[in-house]
Amino acid sequence: MYLEQDGRRYDASLWLTPEGNCAGVAKMVHIMQAAQFYERDYYTPSEEGFLVFGTPWGRVGIVICFDRHLPESIRTCALKGADLVIIPTANTKAEPMELFEWEIRVQAMQNQIFVAMCNRVGREDGMDFAGESLIVHPSGDVIYKADDREQIIVQELDLAEARLWREQKRPYLRQRRPECYL
């Protein structure tokens, strides 16, 4: 969503409680500026980093659109204890959707978290949005993949399963050695 706050404009996503109250606002951190993507012309990058929200079922992070292309985004949510990362995005059919699917699958597996990417559909201002929203298991397997039509996806996830993968099945995060990284 487009958000104006303190004289600045953001690409943002609201975190709503089951009662419909706003419990937080996640803002895009990395703003794309390249041919056909002039987002810095109208968006300000967030200085708040990546937010993770507690729920009765588990912890949920939000990574907005372009942020997902930088692996630190989803990794940060995982290190903050996210069991699920939600990625609202707006990819067009001209973009490499198969590559984007693999990108999400690999990051879900590397971070042992569920990832749900929700993409736009339809046509606006000459752009055809791809849809193909998907939900990925901590193993990297696709649980559900939508087509290019508007639809509502209802999928039950056991978020405790992400913790099981992180702690027992593939404890990759525990193997990290940040002192050896740049």
Predicted region positions:
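CN hydrolase (nitrilase-like) catalytic-core segments centered on the catalytic cysteine
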Residues: 69-152
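A conserved C-terminal secondary-structure "cap"
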Residues: 162-182
